[in-house]
Amino acid sequence: DAFGGIGPILLPMAIAGAGIIISIIGTFLVKISSNDAKEAEVQKALNVGNWTSIILVGLASFGLVNWMLPETMQMEFYGEGLQDISALRVFYATLVGLVVGAAISSFTEYYTGLGKTPILNIVQQSSTGAATNIIAGLATGMISTFSSVLLFAIAIWSSYAFAGFYGVAMAASAMMATTAMQLAIDAFGPIADNAGGIAEMSDQNPIVRERTDILDSVGNTTAATGKGFAIASAALTALALFAAYVTFTEIDGINIFKAPVLAMLFVGGMVPVVFSALAMSSVGKAAMEMVEEVRRQFKEIPGIMEGIAKPEYDKCVDISTKASLRQMLLPGLLTIGFPILIVVVGVLIYPENHKLVAEMLGGYMAGVTVSGVLWAIFQNNAGGAWDNAKKSFEA
């Protein structure tokens, strides 16, 4: 190639660099003509910037692939040996990543966007009480995994078919090329949320709060979309990471027909569930501490509600800061400790068979990956759907 044989190494970085520049261009295309724009108009403006960035990255990728790669190169396919791959097939793998990223944005918007069928269903179910609200929200989060996981499966399979493990890596690189745009869209949510809080606390004109509510409802969707991209990139790179793991440990593969490996697969599947439970429990404990502190201040400091006394803000900040650090200690230790424990126990039980221990750890990682992706999609979309269902009532 034109780079002394390192073109395939430089290509992902070149696409990422082009993606940053293109994302900056995309932000200038996010424009709203009316000061009284509704949710659909705001979402459309953000989509214009996002979709333009994705299309331009696709065009840039085509040029970079043809410039930086040789006409043909050899790629290894697991169990099939080396095969000749054309530069065009690498571009097809890159295109897979972009298309899947765009599709994930669309599906996430559908499941979490204000006025969409899933949100309207949650609103309707809420008319009969909290129980049916919870059922509808859980069902929305669960059904949203269907489209996302199918997209991940298609992306992994097709990108591998086009260019082997390199194709999978290129698909992930292309998907993350618009990270700058995705982060901007993701950050839009909390910025709009905090702006609404400031508007309410500073007694701004009611129309200001109405407009920030519109931005906030769109922000709930964009935040879910940004997290969806992060989940997708993790899922898409799983095959490449397992290939690197197999190469590094010098094992033939991860055979789940072996009892210890299958056992660790189930253990890995359990960890994201327990992690989620611990994280939710931590939030509950921190919230209880905060509520008790606020109640104490209302009781002991007269005049807070009338605005003539100053609350002790530092106490609330101290509670949230300490709780966020202290309560996440156990979930963090769980994720770090289990892999170490598996290796230690494996070496003690099979001191002469280190390859089996490596397979056990690989089985654990496979379980974590599959379970973690499903739980991440479910919680991300269910949370966004509930949040915008709440906005529907407030509106």
PLM-predicted stretches and their roles:
Residues 1-395:
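Hydrophobic packing and interface segments
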